[in-house]
Structures are given as structure tokens and as C-alpha cells.
Design a protein with these regions (language model features):
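Long, low-complexity, polar/charged, intrinsically disordered or flexibly structured peripheral segments
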Residues: 24-85
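Short, small-residue-biased leader/transition segments that mark boundaries at the very start
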Residues: 1-5
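Short, flexible/disordered intra-domain loops and linkers
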Residues: 6-11, 81-85
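Catalytic binding pocket for nucleotide-activated donors in carbohydrate/polymer assembly enzymes
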Residues: 99, 103-186, 190
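Donor nucleotide-activated moiety binding/catalytic core segment of transferases
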Residues: 69-107
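Intrinsically disordered, low-complexity cytosolic loops and termini enriched
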Residues: 8-23
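Generic recognition of flexible, low-complexity loop/linker segments
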Residues: 58-62, 88-90, 111-113, 137-140
Length: 191
């Protein structure tokens, strides 16, 4: 292997810097009725025209418009407490989430869904993560959202079915009453 790879750190996105316009808006505390340019992005990226996530969002017209049913916040950096926008560690943000999705194609274990349930946040994962397989074994069945962890069956050939299962689970969770959601949070923590 080349020595150049030994000196580099691989990161989720090629982050340039936190967005100053977003920082100013957040600091002002004022409600705004006009979106920022690139309203779904928290940090500027180097070579944004080559970023696969941004390309995907453009292809599917994901712009966080008022009538859009799906809103996206793309955070392309590690949440280490010093990112310039949130300035909170990942775990401090995780506890404020209602539901997490880790649609792993393959992870020997998959710590992120485990971390989610440890903080009482229900999650959706797949049977291709070790954690998903463990949950199924623990429950004696495929995990369902009402168990605190939904384990979606994933193969090399069922991407559409996986996407539909995730969509259906998120929609179902959004329809739960606060009492039902709280019960599911406790079940997630029990796992």
C-alpha cells in the first residue's frame, strides 16, 4: 500500500467548513420564511458536484420545500462536539431523536443500532447486521417496530422491498400516539 494512505484519515464526506449563513441564522434565533441556498446541507463540501449523496438528492428533487413530504438534513461530518453547527457529540443528539434507521447492507455487528436502543431510541436495521440477527434470535422472531427494533429482511435483490419496509415503518411510527411511542422506547431500551 502507498504511504499516502497511511497518512490520511477517511471521513464521511469531504467537508470544507460549516456554513456561515446557517450559523448566522441559528444564532439570530429569528424565524425565516426564505430558505438558504442548499437548504438540506449543514456543511459545505469540497467538490460538491461529485458528492454522491447530493447527486441523489438533486436527482429526486429533495429540496426541503414547504410541500415536500420528506425533509432531509445532510450532515456530512462526524458529530464530535466541534463541527461548527451542532457543536454536540453524536450521543447528545441521538437522545433527541424519535427513531433511527440503519439500513446496513453488511456489518459484522453494527454498533449504531445498539447505541440507539441504549438511549431508548427505537430503530430500524436489517438482518445483514450482526445486531439485527441478534435481536431476531433474542426475540425468537423477526423484530418489529413495536418490539423497539424492526429488523428488515435484506438481500442482494430486494432494494425496493427494503425501501418500502422502511417507509412503512417510519410512517407507522409517525402515527403512534405519544403513549405508544413511549412504550416502544422502553421496549427498545429493554433490548
Amino acid at each position: 500500500a502507498s504511504d499516502v494512505y497511511k497518512r490520511q484519515v477517511q471521513v464521511p464526506g469531504w467537508v470544507c467548513c460549516p456554513r456561515e449563513d446557517l450559523k448566522e441564522r441559528l444564532a439570530s434565533g429569528k424565524a425565516c420564511d426564505t430558505p438558504l441556498e442548499w437548504p438540506l446541507l449543514t456543511h459545505w463540501l469540497h467538490e460538491m458536484s461529485h458528492d454522491q449523496v447530493i447527486d441523489y438528492m438533486k436527482r429526486y428533487n429533495m429540496w426541503n420545500l414547504p410541500d415536500d413530504k420528506v425533509k432531509v438534513i445532510f450532515v456530512p461530518c462526524y458529530l464530535d462536539g466541534a463541527d461548527g453547527i451542532f457543536n454536540m457529540h453524536y450521543y447528545d443528539l441521538l437522545i433527541g431523536m424519535d427513531l433511527t434507521v440503519y439500513a446496513s447492507y453488511y456489518e459484522p455487528w453494527g454498533y449504531t443500532p445498539l447505541e440507539s436502543v441504549a438511549f431508548h431510541v427505537p430503530c430500524i436495521t436489517t438482518n445483514l447486521s450482526g445486531f439485527g440477527l441478534w435481536v431476531n434470535q433474542l426475540l425468537g422472531k423477526d423484530g418489529e417496530l413495536t418490539d423497539g427494533v424492526q429488523v428488515v429482511r435484506r438481500t442482494d435483490y430486494n432494494s425496493s422491498e427494503v425501501a418500502d419496509a422502511i417507509k412503512d415503518a417510519v410512517t407507522a411510527y409517525a402515527a403512534f400516539t405519544p403513549q405508544e411511542a413511549e412504550k416502544i422506547r422502553h421496549k427498545a431500551a429493554d433490548i
